[in-house]
């Protein structure tokens, strides 16, 4: 669980600028931070604790996990945009933002995460 918490925090930190900068004109900073936390709480535990048990093939797992995160987070952002009537934000913008955020956290997280997991393992 400690490893997951470190990787969850890393994911949030990596996605922070990707979500907050484009949403800044329509969303106050504190609400942006809350949104970021909510998005990751909606997807990250499922990606880490549920989906790996469903797939033996690592490639299939990663593809499904990333698609799941992009779609769910995009739907949440798009739903909020529609509910709050953000004129410049539609479903396509929300999905694009979700894709970009998850691509950053998956790519950079893949590189850094293995090093962190190894480092955390040394502390045990």
Predicted regions and their residues:
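N-terminal signal-anchor/start-transfer transmembrane helix
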Residues: 8-24, 73
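A generic, lipid-embedded transmembrane alpha helix
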Residues: 35-54
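Juxtamembrane boundary at the C-terminal end of a transmembrane helix
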Residues: 106-124
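Hydrophobic transmembrane alpha-helical segments in integral membrane proteins
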Residues: 1-14, 121
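Membrane-helix boundary connector in multi-pass membrane proteins
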Residues: 75-97
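Non-cytosolic membrane-interface motifs at loop->transmembrane helix junctions
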Residues: 58-66, 123-124
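Hydrophobic alpha-helical membrane segments
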Residues: 43-44, 62-81
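Membrane-interface helix-boundary motifs at transmembrane edges
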Residues: 23-34, 82-90
